[in-house]
């Protein structure tokens, strides 16, 4: 459990448990409704062995946001090189614009960077809708750059933009 990482407001970021599944599904479906049927996608990610799920909660243990971070070996990189993929980042609507998304993203980047120092995780990638201007700005502030400006489309019709942040490797 990590208490108050990076000094943002009172709260905790912790690993999700099976008890969080209903909240994760409902919140994900609500936050991502414009992009497609997240409710049908999320269960396969929640229980995939290569995906880590973290929940941000307030001091009363009420969840406010979550991240899903997957790790995989991409076909476009040398063998035994891994990528951390931010599969989802969501903040419940009642808690948006309060720094929670920034906090969750910082946590994910720190986690992937730490993994990269110990393993062959060379970068973090994510996909975002071209209409999600706030998220695009947030990701750019955290060092993400556009990798593919036309990475397909969401079920809602939005163009998908693939972004990445490379990690420095110590030699």
What are these regions (language model features)?
Residues 2-11, 15-96, 102-118, 166-168:
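Acetyl-CoA-dependent GNAT
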Residues 44-48, 131, 153-157:
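A short beta-turn/loop motif at secondary-structure boundaries
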Residues 98, 102, 150-151, 157, ...:
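Acyl-donor (CoA/ACP) binding surface of acyl/acetyltransferases
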Residues 104, 132-135:
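Conserved short alpha-helix immediately C-terminal to the canonical SAM/SAH-binding motif I
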Residues 125-128, 140, 145-162:
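Conserved catalytic-core motifs of GNAT/GCN5-like acyltransferases
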């Amino acid at each position: 459990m990590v208490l108050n990482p990076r000094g943002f407001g009172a709260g905790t970021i912790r690993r999700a448990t099976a008890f969080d599944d209903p909240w994760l599904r409902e919140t994900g479906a609500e936050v991502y409704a414009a992009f497609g049927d997240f409710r049908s996608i999320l269960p396969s990610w929640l229980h995939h062995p290569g995906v880590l799920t973290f929940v941000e909660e307030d001091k009363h243990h009420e969840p406010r946001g979550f991240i899903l971070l997957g790790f995989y070996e991409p076909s476009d990189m040398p063998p035994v090189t891994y990528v951390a993929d931010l599969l989802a980042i969501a903040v419940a609507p009642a808690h948006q614009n309060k720094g929670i998304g920034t906090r969750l993203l910082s946590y994910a980047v720190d986690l992937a960077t730490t993994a990269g120092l110990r393993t062959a995780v060379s970068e973090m990638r994510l996909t975002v809708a071209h209409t999600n201007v706030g998220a695009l700005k947030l990701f750019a502030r955290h060092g993400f750059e556009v990798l593919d400006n036309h990475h397909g489309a969401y079920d809602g019709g939005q163009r998908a933009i693939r972004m990445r942040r490379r990690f420095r490797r110590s030699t």
